[in-house]
Amino acid sequence: MSSWFNVGILCLLRFKNVQDNKIIFEAIFEVFLHFLKIPVYMTHLGFPITPTVCLIEMLGLLLLLLIPALFTLIWIYKYIEPHSLISIPGIFVFLGLYVPFVVTLLIPIDVTWDVSLSIWRFLYWLTFVLSWIILPFVQGYMESKFSTPRSRLSDSFYKNLRYYLLLTFLTCVVIAYLRFALRTMSFSNFKELVISLTYFWGLLFVIFLLGNGFVYVPVSMWKKAFITKRAALLERQAVGVYSKLQARLESYSLPSSSISLNNGRNQSSSDFFTSSLTDHAFNPHSSPNGMSNVIALQTTWNQMVKEYNRIMLIKTAKASGSYRLYLPDSYIPIHPVVAYAFYVWILPAFRILFSIFMASMSVIIVVSEVFLHTQYSLVGIILQKFTNSSATSIFVSFLFVYYMRYCTYKSLMRTQFAPHYYYALVPFRATNTASLIYFASQLCRLTLPLCYNFVSLQPYPTQFHQFYGESIDLLPLGNLISKRYPTFILLPIIFSMISLKYRLRQFIYSITLRKSSSASSSDDFDDSSLNSENDDDLFNETSAAYLAEGRALLLGTNNAHV
């Protein structure tokens, strides 16, 4: 009531001696700004507080809210059919993707200017409620096998109740340890403990995903610039994707004898897919994600075949020396000479330059992580060079934080954890609703720790650090984690550079082959036939036999389509 009373008194004082419309206009704007408490950022640039400046300010804030909403809708339309999102889950999915985008845009502004603490409090608790309560509940509802809404609500409630009880037990263990063992915890700062625990949980995955993305994103862009490497990558992935598609179809009791890795060369997988569905009844609710799992793999396979076909056309055009490239499946008709120049010269050169730029960004951020909270942080040194230009400082900060966000999310999409086998984001609107809800909840959990990690790389005080960082640093455990753990980013980088996962897989395959060889020799079989190069090469994803198998699958499907 007091705020409304103050606004009313301000109106009376303003309108008491009103003489013209200009004073009325200024009074309305001052009352509006007083009520909303909107910080006028243009005053930092030397502009006086006038109605015109306030109008420009509000239009800028409106654009700041509408641009992320537009990109969020485009992103959702890229991965899922809009009609598949029913009203209430669709709203929460939109919020789960929209709020991290807004936070990413506000961080560069907060580095240069000041964003209100009330905004950060609202955004933090909104992401907290979305990621830990609402989105898991909606996801459980969408994945429930029951048919009625009431039974699905009950099923989702009991599933999440077990999860929350486990989290509560772990939280109580941490509180007891801090309170009685270290004597650094009091119940007066329970809110700070919750913020620290959620921050550590998010940072634990952010550093791993960020380090993996710093290697994967530039390397993948570099490989795309060379058609030979891109073709080899598709050939190497073809057998795995085709095998997963076969396994999914077999798990849904579709005829498994109609498809195999050898006979599949003479039949299109899409033709098999269509004929299987027309000849046999299929219940979409027979599995947690229903038919969408098969559709996602089928879409991935079709896009691989389409891209491999384009690579073959580019190779043929380069070998012919005609400087003409004909693309019959192109959405936009392009002149053959223009298509040749774009796909052979312009696009590869752009990808090479862009991969070098992203590799440089990765090196700068990794060095800054190693020298965190020191004067040797390269991100802080670069931002200090642009202190005289606020717009340039915001732009450079946005480049760094968006690149970190892109590497983290890209690594999250490709990380082969157990849940991600069912929660996969597939473009061309082949993603199921449960996968989109799952990734929206993960983005909400990872965005704030990621943004705070970026804020720690630069020396300027921010309102985000005042709310989020001081709550973390209030506890010795949170302070230790925020200052020491980011240096472990070198571990996932080293693992990605040496392809540790591939080497471990090859080691396991070699042990399996050795055991099978010894078992066969004890049964008086011929050792040479079991240790032949063909058997060995079937497990080697870089061998000529493995690549030839993938090439045959891709070309066989392509010829079937033709």
From Swiss-Prot:
Pfam families: LMBR1. It is a multi-pass membrane protein. Belongs to the LIMR family. GO terms for cellular component: cytoplasm; Golgi apparatus; Golgi membrane; membrane; plasma membrane. Residues 44-55, 109-121, 186-198, 351, 402-479 are cytoplasmic. Its main location: Golgi. It is found in: Golgi apparatus membrane. Keywords: Golgi apparatus, Membrane, Transmembrane, Transmembrane helix. This is LIMR family protein C622.11. The chain crosses the membrane at residues 23-43, 56-76, 88-108, 122-142, 165-185, 199-219, 330-350, 352-372, 381-401, 480-500.
